[in-house]
Structure formats: structure tokens, C-alpha cells
Amino acid sequence: MQNRNGNMRAVSLLSGGLDSSTLLSLVVSRGYEVVALSFDYGQRHSRELDSARKIAEYYKVEHKIMKIDLRPIGGSALTENISVPDVDLENIGKDIPVTYVPARNTILLSIALGLAEVTDSSKIFIGANALDYSGYPDCRPEYFDSINETFSLATKKTVEGGHIEVEAPLLKYSKADIVRLAVKLETPLGLTWSCYKGGKKACGVCDSCKLRLKGFMEAGSEDPIEYETVPAFYKKYLNTRE
């Protein structure tokens, strides 16, 4: 949607991971003037934020990093010293994981709403996808319907007839679908980071690494980043490509 001066403006949440980076590629390809918004919320490591900076620089978009500390709230392996268990691939997504951060999307989207109003943006883009809403309550389609209704009542711009809408274009996409889209859009996948752990290489054993590699395998592509440990299923896949 165009704003008053004819330019399409949007805020796109950017963590530096596969999903949000592919999303930024998509939003840029649609012709939006984008402000990429990242959050330093007290997560265990800054590796993903480093990737977010590189992705934003690659696309030459304005990039804001908001510092908010969610650690006092607790309740998540991403902000507390709670171990992230190794879960079998087939069991990932069956329960709400320990990496769920209480009310994170509501908090982050509320900040994005303020930025969208100030920048006269009509859209807030978030990279939630099909796998997310199987495990995270704030990534479900009904959640986004509800938050859009709330946001329509929450700002001066919207109550005066303006429009700000949260959109999750990848909501029905699997990881493999996202990888295919990223390849099509020439997203710089080698700059992205999905691992729950910091370090020079992704661990290859956390849920996020396994799901990422499974997505590349099912998409028929090879992940360009390096891993400390390569899961057996992905090794087998790589052997079939040689």
C-alpha cells in the first residue's frame, strides 16, 4: 500500500536468520522502501545480529537495532541459562519448545508498530512460517488476525483513517519452500545465521540447525554455511549430490 507521497514504505523484522533474511529479499523485490528492524533483547549471543547487519548492508536498507532486555522476564532458553535439548527431527514442533520467549512477538511487533507510524509505513513484515505456528502460539494465523485488529485501534495514524498492517508472507511456507524462494530471489544465504549457539560455525545439532538443513535437503540445495557437526541425514544427502 502506498503512503501519502506515493512511496511504498514498510518495516521488516530482521533477525539475521534464514526466514527473516528471505523475507527482506521478498519485501525489497516488491518495491518497498524498507526499514529493517532488529532487536538485541538479551539473547545468548550476538551472532545472529551480526548477520542481520550484513544482510541489511547487502540490500542497502536502513537498519535499526533496538535494545530491549527480556532477560528479567525469563522463561526461555534463548535468554536464560536453560539448556537447549537435542530433539529428534521427527519430534520437533510437536510441543512448545524451551526456546519460546514469552510474548516475544507481541512485544517486538508493538515496537515495530511505533516505528511504522513514525516512518509513515503501511506494512510491518514478519517472517513467521508454517513450522513456527506448529510450535509457537504467537505465530499462528489467528494471532496475526487478532493483532491486526488491535493495531488498527492503537495509533493516531490508524484511528485517523491511515493503515498499518502486519503481514506474514511466509506463513504457509515450509522450510524447503523458504529455501526455494531464497534461491529464486538470490538471497545471500551464506550471510544468514540460524543456530541457537554462537561461534564461528553453526553447531548442527540444535533444533534450528536441523530444521534449516532439512529445508535445504528437501529443496534440493546445499547450505553454504559451515557446521561443527553435520547430521547423518544431511551427510547422506550430500553424498547423493556428489
For each feature predicted by the language model, list its residue ranges.
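ATP-dependent adenylation/nucleotidyltransferase module used to activate substrates
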Residues: 2-185
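Compositionally biased, intrinsically disordered low-complexity regions
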Residues: 76-77, 206, 222
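Short Fe-S-cluster ligation motifs
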Residues: 210-212, 216-242
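Local cysteine-cluster metal-coordination motifs and their immediate loop/turn environment
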Residues: 110, 193-214
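Charge-dense, low-complexity polyampholytic segments
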Residues: 124, 196-203, 221-229
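Serine/threonine-rich low-complexity intrinsically disordered regions
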Residues: 69, 88, 206, 226-231
